[in-house]
Amino acid sequence: IVMQQAKDAKYAGYYNVGPDDCDCVSTGELADLFVKHWGEPAAWKNVAEANAPHEAGFLKLDCAKLKKRFGWAPIWHVDQAVAETVHWYQAWAEDKDLTAVTEEQIREFLSVK
């Protein structure tokens, strides 16, 4: 995206990057996936407070602009994307070399095609 934006101003702007419709999950399902991939002792509990502001139970990014302009499609399904996100945050929590972790994840991602 950045390379195209540098070459041609018609690509300027912002783009949402997210899952296909078939991979959209509720916020609770997303939390469940995070806990599953983090492992013990991770847990979460849905506790609604009486006067709390409304929280959306389902959030979705509209990636139509990105798909139309670049022919983009997600490579990882939601489970894999969450697993890789958890892996990165675990590396951060363990004070690992985040540059190395990030570069490895990029290599893995680019090798999927």
What do these predicted regions represent?
Residues 3-7, 38, 93:
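Protein kinase-like catalytic domain
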Residues 7, 19-23:
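Glycine-rich "substrate-gating" loop/helix at the edge of Rossmann-like oxidoreductase active sites
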Residues 78-113:
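Amphipathic terminal alpha-helices
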Residues 13-15, 28-31, 39-58, 101-107:
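C-terminal "lid/loop" region of Rossmann-like NAD(P)-dependent oxidoreductases
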Residues 25-37, 81-85:
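PAPS/PAP-binding and catalytic site of the sulfotransferase fold
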Residues 1-15:
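Alpha-helical substrate-binding/gating segment
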Residues 14, 51-73, 92-94:
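Conserved C-terminal active-site "lid" loop/helix of NAD(P)H-dependent oxidoreductases
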